[in-house]
């Protein structure tokens, strides 16, 4: 591992992201592809950049990310969580700012399981009084 490389693991829904940060020019590589190639949706790209824009380090750090599991939204959230954790390892003084923005807290919401006798997690069969 490089001497000044920082690491953070992020999770959201069923996605897991491993984020490596080092000083550089602002290059973001996700699963050997650029941010623009990996995420087609502008909202997902925005979510990924949020912690960097908050601490104004968009052009100062290079990010190497591997992410797997889940869909686009979950992966973007996992990457954001991972970047936040790596930034805190890089500079602990950023923690309060990132916490205020709500990036430090792991979003614990997951898909609710389907129950027996119901169509979905909460959708019940139609009720007939007579």
Swiss-Prot record:
The keyword Ribonucleoprotein applies. This is Small ribosomal subunit protein uS9. Belongs to the universal ribosomal protein uS9 family. The keyword Ribosomal protein applies. One of its GO terms (biological process) is translation. Keywords: Ribonucleoprotein, Ribosomal protein. Gene3D superfamilies: 3.30.230.10. HAMAP family: Ribosomal_uS9_B. GO terms for molecular function: RNA binding; structural constituent of ribosome. Pfam families: Ribosomal_S9. The gene is rpsI. NCBIfam families: PRK00132.1. One of its GO terms (cellular component) is cytosolic small ribosomal subunit.
